[in-house]
Amino acid sequence: MLIFLWCGAVCVSLLGAANIPPHPLNLINFMEMIRYTIPCEKTWGEYADYGCYCGAGGSGRPIDALDRCCYVHDNCYGDAEKKHKCNPKTQSYSYKLTKRTIICYGAAGTCARIVCDCDRTAALCFGNSEYIERHKNIDTKRHCR
C-alpha cells in the first residue's frame, strides 16, 4: 500500500513538473448535456464539425439555427473569460438533468454557474434546432466569411 501511495505521489509530481496543460474538465459535462437534449439517432460528436461555429474556432455568419447555438455558446465562453476571468474549458460545475431540462447549481455570478449556464443554454438550443446533414463538414473557407 505504501509503495502504491509513493508511486501515485511521484506520478502527480512528474505531471506537475512536466507543465502539462489541464484537460477540459467540463467537456464531459457538456457532452452529457448535449446527449440529454438531442434526438436519439444523433451523437454529440456529430455536432463537433457543423456549420461555421460548431467545433474549434469560428468565423463569418452562422449558417442556420443550430450553428447559431454554437455561435452564442462561443460568445458566452468569451464573456466568461473576459468579463468574469473564468476559464470555461477547465471550470468544473454541478448540474442535474431532469424532466427534459437542465438545472445548474451554484451561486449566481460564480465561474461555475456562469460556465454551466453557457453549456446548458447551448445544449437546450441544440435540442430545439434542426440538424441539417449538408451543414456537417462544410468548406468553412467558402461558406464562413
From Swiss-Prot:
Ca(2+) binds at residues 53, 55, 57, 74. One of its GO terms (molecular function) is calcium ion binding. Residues 1-17 form the signal peptide. Its EC number is 3.1.1.4. CDD domains: PLA2c. Disulfide bonds join 52-144, 54-70, 69-125, 76-118, 86-111, 104-116. One of its GO terms (biological process) is phospholipid metabolic process. It is found in: Secreted. Residues 18-25 form a propeptide. InterPro entries: PLipase_A2 (IPR001211), PLipase_A2_Asp_AS (IPR033112), PLipase_A2_dom (IPR016090), PLipase_A2_dom_sf (IPR036444), PLipase_A2_His_AS (IPR033113). It comes from the Eukaryota. PROSITE patterns: PA2_ASP, PA2_HIS. GO terms for cellular component: extracellular region. Binds 1 Ca(2+) ion. Belongs to the phospholipase A2 family. Group I subfamily. D49 sub-subfamily. Snake venom phospholipase A2 (PLA2) that inhibits neuromuscular transmission by blocking acetylcholine release from the nerve termini. PLA2 catalyzes the calcium-dependent hydrolysis of the 2-acyl groups in 3-sn-phosphoglycerides. Heterodimer; disulfide-linked. The A chains have phospholipase A2 activity and the B chains show homology with the basic protease inhibitors. The A2 chain is found in beta-3 and beta-4 bungarotoxins. This is Basic phospholipase A2 beta-bungarotoxin A2 chain. The lineage of its organism: Eukaryota, Metazoa, Chordata, Craniata, Vertebrata.
